[in-house]
Amino acid sequence: MGLTFFDKARELTEELEKTQAESIHQAAKLVADSIMNDGIIQAFGSGHSYAAAIEVCGRAGGLIPSKVIMDPAGGYYESIEGVGSLLTHRLQAKPNDIFFLISNSGRNPMGIELAEWIKSQGCKLIVVTALDASQTAASRHSSGKLLYEFADVILDNRSVQGDAALELEGLEGKVCGTSSFSAVLLLQQTIYEAVELMLEKGYTPPVYRSANIDGGYEYNFAIEDKFADRIFHL
C-alpha cells in the first residue's frame, strides 16, 4: 500500500510552484506595503476554510499585525444572503489594511458580501480559491458574482470541483480534500516573501515567536500591545 495522498501532495506542490509563483509575488508585495504603512492583515475563511485563515493570523512565525475575522456560526449560514453584510457591522478597516478571503468555491453570499464591503473601504483583497471550479460554479448571491471577481490578487489552490481528489475502488465519491494543504503552501510562501521584501527595504517586521519557547510570550505581548486596539476582538 503506497502513500497515495503524499503522492498527490507532491504533484500539487509542483503544480502550485509552476502556476502560482507570480501571484504569490504580487500578494507578498501587497502584504509588505500594508504592514510598512501601518496596516494589518485581516483574514476570513468560512467553515473549514477557517483553518487557512489562522495560517496568517496569530501564529508563530507569522506577522503580529494580524486578525482573524470570526464567524460566530462557523459557516452554518454562509449560503444565506445578508449574513455577510451583518458580519461587516462588527468589522473595522483602514485603507492600508490587507484582507485575505479564503473560499474553495467562492460562490456563497457570506464571502461575496464581505468582499463587497472590503472593496468599499478602499482595501486590497487577496482571494484564495479553486479558480477553475469557481469559474464553473453558479453564484448563490443575487448579484451573480463570485468571490474571485473582487480580488486584487488570486491565489489559485488548484483544487478540483468538490475538493476531494482521490478515488478508491468500491467508493462512489472521492476522498481527501486538497484545498487546506495547498492554502498552507500559498499563504506561508506569501508571508515569507512579504517579510523578505520588508527586510530588503530596511524595515524589520514584527513576527510572532512561539509562546512555547522561553520568553516568547513576553516578546509577543510587548509588540501586540502596540496593535491592541486593532488586532484583538472585544
Curated annotation (Swiss-Prot):
Gene Ontology process terms (BP): D-glycero-D-manno-heptose 7-phosphate biosynthetic process
Listed Pfam families: SIS_2
One GO CC term, this protein: cytosol
Gene3D superfamilies for the chain: Glucose-6-phosphate isomerase like protein, domain 1
GO molecular function: carbohydrate derivative binding; D-sedoheptulose 7-phosphate isomerase activity
Domain SIS: 31-205
SUPFAM superfamilies: SIS domain
NCBIfam families per record: PRK02947.1
PANTHER family: PHOSPHOHEPTOSE ISOMERASE (PTHR30390:SF7), SEDOHEPTULOSE 7-PHOSPHATE ISOMERASE / DNAA INITIATOR-ASSOCIATING FACTOR FOR REPLICATION INITIATION (PTHR30390)
Family the entry assigns: Belongs to the UPF0309 family.
Name of this protein: UPF0309 protein lmo0025
Organism field: Listeria monocytogenes serovar 1/2a (strain ATCC BAA-679 / EGD-e)
Lineage: Bacteria, Bacillati, Bacillota, Bacilli, Bacillales
